Amino acid sequence: MARNKIALIGAGQIGGTLAHLAGLKELGDIVLFDIAEGTPQGKALDLAESAPVDGFNAHLSGANDYSAIEGADVVIVTAGVPRKPGMSRDDLLGINLKVMESVGAGIKTYAKDAFVICITNPLDAMVWALQKASGLPPQKVVGMAGVLDSARFRYFLSDEFKVSVEDVTAFVLGGHGDDMVPLLRYSTVAGIPLPDLVKIGWTTQEKLDAIVKRTRGGGGEIVNLLKTGSAFYAPAASAIAMAESYLKDKRRVLPVAAQLNGEYGVDKLYVGVPVVIGANGVEKVVEITLDDAEKELFKKSVASVQGLVEACKTINPAFA
């Protein structure tokens, strides 16, 4: 039986980490693609030479031509530029929109049956543009944000309660930005909802509010510490969890940026919600009940995403 094929578009920090994790988990053969000549080839060779030590079997290759991704089962997109000091939102949108056009065209030509995971920021707008540019069915194109944001939320909660991260469940709704909505009511420690843990004196509402605030700024906190880039270990691990659920038909319930078609009162926008990921991509959108306060926060988050999408349409009317 042929191995699965995983194409990684962008061979930067996240791309290299994705390749390493995919190899360690033996998810399939791996192609690293980048426009920078030598970079994907060098990283692929370096990782291939680690296989005998780590004991994994996967063929790794690097390429500068989209034909190398032909027949990929999964495509993970990290290509694009990060926001730099002095760069406006529209500057970033304009540059990365062009990248999504080119990546989308490559996927359309060579990997039209793939499950596509977008990591490029601003995430919710870029995954929307990538789906448009690739022409793939919306259930086969998703954005990686909620898994990462939820992981950060879970880590901060486990640190607060001094318990294993395995016993903390939490998820985040909405866009991947300052308006994301970490849901305290639906987050638990060993099955006990956070509001109940406040009642029994394990923590305070003030501490939970501080954790929510830190979760919203989680990416920025790492950027400020690194000074030369942004997070890559946790984003890569998050995307691999999504890819693995698809490839192995695990049907995990994961928060991802998925296209909504009326769910949560949202139409034709990519927004972070819990979904079931299986062999068909997004198998189901899980629509949970929100209270009035949560609805308002979610609505604000959706409005931010809508603003980014409208800006994309203004920059390039072909996306309208």
Curated annotation (Swiss-Prot):
InterPro entries: L-lactate/malate_DH, Lactate/malate_DH_C, Lactate/malate_DH_N, Lactate_DH/Glyco_Ohase_4_C, Malate_DH_type3, NAD(P)-bd_dom_sf. Its EC number is 1.1.1.37. The active site is at residue 176. It holds the Pfam family Ldh_1_N. Belongs to the LDH/MDH superfamily. MDH type 3 family. Coiled coil: none annotated. It comes from the Bacteria. GO terms for biological process: lactate metabolic process; tricarboxylic acid cycle. Catalyzes the reversible oxidation of malate to oxaloacetate. NAD(+) binds at residues 10-15, 34, 96, 119-121. Substrate binds at residues 83, 89, 121, 152. HAMAP family: Malate_dehydrog_3 (MF_00487). One of its GO terms (molecular function) is L-lactate dehydrogenase activity. The keyword Oxidoreductase applies. It is an enzyme of class 1 (oxidoreductase). The gene is mdh. It catalyses: (S)-malate + NAD(+) = oxaloacetate + NADH + H(+). This is Malate dehydrogenase.
